[in-house]
Amino acid sequence: MQKERSPEQYQNAIHNALQDSQRVIKLIDGLLNLAKADYEPEQIKREEIRLDELLLDARELVLRAYPDFHVELVFEQEAEDDKVLTVIGNSYLLTTAFVNLIENNCKYSRNQTSFIQISFWEEWSIIRLSDDGVGMSDKDKEHLFQLFYRGENKDVASGYGIGMTLAQKILSLHKGEISVFSHPGEGTTYVVKLPHI
């Protein structure tokens, strides 16, 4: 038999149910995107993409989902040719990868901020995504791209251990590279290299 509850208790129950359903949706979306990242490269629709525009789109998606987050985008050097900012790839997948990286920066930083720097060198477009957060141990760095791995700082932010694996697979699918530089208490920097046209 159900007991009587106050309107406030019903509101809390509905709020909790909505949060649970949003978490399940995010988990399912992550798993579906992971499956897409496992496609053969020939199966992926590709086009020329301006990285600066893609990063602005990713920034907008993050800020829409998390209004308290801050994302700063800086160009380290002026591009004399648009080609150094243009890659061949799948816009949806690359946006997904960068949204995951930006969200991680913001979730684990002290002030919910991600600093993004764009530069280029030889055949590479280079994107550095940094935070001033809790950082990570060598053990966490070693397992960072392992599916479902949650590091020592898992209590700081919610997640499922899918985002970093997904980002790495997507970047690899685009002949890119990702590396992580971090020390406990000193923040984290992800360095992404993608071949430009």
Describe each model-derived feature in a short phrase:
Residues 113-123:
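Short beta-strand/loop element within the Bergerat-fold HATPase_c
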Residues 5, 9, 39-44, 82-89:
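Conserved micro-motifs of the catalytic ATP-binding
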Residues 45-63:
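A conserved beta-strand-to-alpha-helix junction within the catalytic ATP-binding
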Residues 19-24:
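Short alpha-helical segment of the dimerization/phosphotransfer core of two-component systems
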Residues 136-148:
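Short conserved segment of the HATPase_c
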Residues 105-106:
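Short helix-loop "hinge" at the ATP-lid/N-box region of the Bergerat-fold HATPase_c
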Residues 175-177:
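Conserved glycine-rich
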